[in-house]
Design a protein with these regions (language model features):
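Glycine-rich phosphate-binding loop of nucleotide-binding enzymes
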Residues: 1-56
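P-loop NTPase motor domains
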Residues: 33-49, 58-231
Length: 231
C-alpha cells in the first residue's frame, strides 16, 4: 500500500520482470497501462513469442478466440469456460437458464468440439460454432424431438447474432491470431476502457479466469503468478 507516486508500479515492474526471467508464468490485470513498457520489452526480446498485451482501442478492439487450442485438448475446465461464456452472452443476470437449456448448450459445445477435432479444416471460433448450431445442431434437436420450449434454437441464435461475423461485436470472439495463452509467460489484460462496459467486461473476466485456471491445471511444477492491480 502507498499513495499515488510512491513507486508501487515501479517496484512491481521490477519484481515481475525478475520472476519472468526465472521462468514464472505471469498474468497481470491492470488499469492505467502500468506494464505496457515491460510487456513491449518482453515482446521485443522474445521476437514476438511472449509479452501479450490485451487492450481496447477504437481502431483495434480487444478480441479473443476462446475456442482455439494449439493441441486440440479440451478438458473439463476448457469446455465449462466456453459454456459459461456463451451463457453469459445469451442470458441476462436476472434470467437464469433452465436445466433443459443448460443440457442443450452443453451438448452443442461437446458435439462442436468433436466435429472440429475430427475435421481440422474447420477453424475453431465463435463463427463456426454459430454455423454449427444453426445447421448441424438444429438437425440433432429435430431428430431428438427437443421441444422449442425446452430449447429455442432460433431465439438462441438471434440473441448471439451480434457476436457473429459482421455483427456489432463480431470481432470479440473471432480473433484470427490463433493465440494459445497456455504457454505464454507474460500476459497483460488492460481493463481501463472495458471495465464499465456491460458486454465486454464479463467476457474479458471469463477469459482471464479460464487462462489462469488452464495454467494451474496443465503446467505442473511451474511457478505461476496472477497480479491484479487496483483490486
Amino acid at each position: 500500500l502507498g499513495p499515488s507516486g510512491s513507486g508501487k508500479s515501479f517496484f512491481t515492474n521490477h519484481l515481475v520482470r525478475q520472476y519472468w526471467e526465472q521462468g514464472t508464468h505471469i498474468l497481470l490485470v491492470d488499469t492505467g497501462n502500468s506494464y505496457k513498457g515491460l510487456c513491449d520489452l518482453i515482446h521485443q526480446k522474445t521476437g514476438g513469442d511472449d509479452g501479450i498485451y490485451f487492450t481496447y482501442k477504437e481502431n483495434d478492439p480487444i478480441s479473443f478466440n476462446p475456442f482455439f487450442t494449439e493441441d486440440y485438448q479440451y478438458d473439463i475446465e476448457k469446455r465449462d469456460s466456453i459454456k459459461t461464456l456463451i451463457l453469459t452472452l445469451w442470458k441476462r443476470e436476472d434470467e437464469p437458464p433452465r436445466r433443459s437449456e443448460e443440457v442443450a448448450l452443453s451438448n452443442a459445445v461437446s458435439l462442436y468440439i468433436g466435429k472440429i477435432r475430427k475435421n481440422r479444416k474447420i477453424k475453431p471460433n465463435f463463427n463456426s460454432f454459430y454455423d454449427f448450431v444453426r445447421k448441424d445442431y438444429r438437425k440433432v434437436l429435430a431428430d431428438k424431438n427437443v421441444r422449442e420450449k425446452d430449447f429455442d434454437v432460433d431465439g438462441f441464435l438471434n440473441v448471439l447474432e451480434p457476436y457473429y461475423k459482421n455483427g456489432e461485436y463480431g470481432y470479440l470472439l473471432n480473433s484470427d491470431k490463433e493465440l494459445d495463452l497456455l504457454n505464454k509467460r507474460f500476459i497483460v489484460f488492460e481493463l481501463d476502457v472495458v471495465k464499465d462496459n456491460p458486454i465486454l467486461f464479463p467476457v474479458v473476466t471469463i477469459i482471464i479466469m479460464e487462462t489462469f485456471i488452464n495454467k494451474m491445471r496443465r503446467l505442473q511444477g511451474i511457478r505461476k503468478m496472477i497480479l491484479i492491480e487496483e483490486a
